């Protein structure tokens, strides 16, 4: 018998997560405790519930710029090795609790050196937190693999340095590189040197593109930068037309994105909150899925968006009527698109994801 698609049941399904920001996923209680421990005095509230409400309200601003402002507070309490280790450990713990079996969690090392740490020490602390979190999850009966993407800020000028950091740590848990931050005025082509360095070292990278800015950002990310994946990429819908009879026509950019199987790291709730789309029901996720783009489901920022992978999946189920086979396909899409070796991807798909979804589907 098919298992009902409730939040409780969806939480039991295995999940693969490609787009999750470490500094966007802290527990409100941890933000408060770290602020007190390290003397960070700029928090807008000193109560856990009030602080959670602050982050949630800011997320629902309808603006990417406003959505990003509260990160000053999470980054502000992540300036020591101990704090970074704790946040990374709890990230793994929370994801494992939601039955995420594979995750690539990204963060920008350059934002965590205000306390005097070097970039290498920052990455060391995060990777140690991930490793210890994996061990603790396994001891609790929840196996999870977490890998890291190091991110450069697109408005800054350290992208080549961060790309070199990715290569230095490529055998220790860093599987790729990313650029993030406000898109408008900061095109991905400002960082060609970093992307060329990654390609020259046979390394993988994703680019935040097509979230708050339109098709030119996606075009540059694909045509000039050579992105392996797109962070968000939701504005590709601007290159797709749907006729009154339902026939879908792809523009040249949309067609190459689909035909090359370039994965889209879609983050439905975040896209609504930043104003990229009006509602989950109006999100182009379903159009892209039906048109056979390689779509994946992601959280973006679990604290700011007050979300989880299970909640993101449930919202899509409620909006578009998806079944277990659809959720399995989106999960397999993500696993296929991950930056770990092929045999590791295949093992998780064949040994974990497919069997567990088969049980849920009945």
UniProtKB/Swiss-Prot annotation:
This is Adenosine deaminase. Catalyzes the hydrolytic deamination of adenosine and 2-deoxyadenosine. The record marks 232 as: Important for catalytic activity. Binds 1 zinc ion per subunit. Its EC number is 3.5.4.4. Zn(2+) binds at residues 19, 21, 208, 300. It catalyses: adenosine + H2O + H(+) = inosine + NH4(+); 2'-deoxyadenosine + H2O + H(+) = 2'-deoxyinosine + NH4(+). Keywords: Hydrolase, Metal-binding, Nucleotide metabolism, Zinc. HAMAP family: A_deaminase. GO terms for cellular component: cytosol. GO terms for molecular function: 2'-deoxyadenosine deaminase activity; adenosine deaminase activity; zinc ion binding. The active site is at residue 211. It holds the Pfam family A_deaminase. It comes from Mycobacterium sp. (strain KMS). The keyword Oxidoreductase does not apply. InterPro entries: A_deaminase, A_deaminase_dom, Ado/ade_deaminase, Metal_Hydrolase. Its cofactor is Zn(2+). Substrate binds at residues 21, 23, 181. GO terms for biological process: adenosine catabolic process; hypoxanthine salvage; inosine biosynthetic process; nucleotide metabolic process; purine ribonucleoside monophosphate biosynthetic process. Belongs to the metallo-dependent hydrolases superfamily. Adenosine and AMP deaminases family. Adenosine deaminase subfamily.
